[in-house]
């Protein structure tokens, strides 16, 4: 969902939390 190509999307981190 992030415009910039990140190695670990923030939305994924939130899901893991």
Swiss-Prot record:
* InterPro entries on file: MGTL
Pfam families in the record: MGTL
Keyword rRNA processing, does the record have it?
no
Q: Does the keyword Lipoprotein apply?
A: no
| Assigned keywords, A-Z | Leader peptide
The text of the family note is: Belongs to the MgtL family.
Query: What is the documented function of this protein?
Result: Makes mgtA transcription sensitive to intracellular proline levels. At low levels of proline this proline-rich protein cannot be fully translated, and stem loop 'C' forms in the mgtA 5' UTR which permits transcription of the downstream mgtA gene. Osmotic shock induction (0.3 M NaCl) also depends on mgtL translation. The distance between the mtgL-translating ribosome and the nucleotides which form the downstream stem loop 'C' is critical for mgtL-mediated transcription of mgtA. Cotranscribed with mgtA.
Specify the protein name: mgtA leader peptide
Source species of the chain: Salmonella typhimurium (strain 14028s / SGSC 2262)
């Amino acid at each position: 969902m992030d415009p910039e190509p990140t190695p670990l999307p923030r939305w994924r981190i939130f899901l893991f939390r």
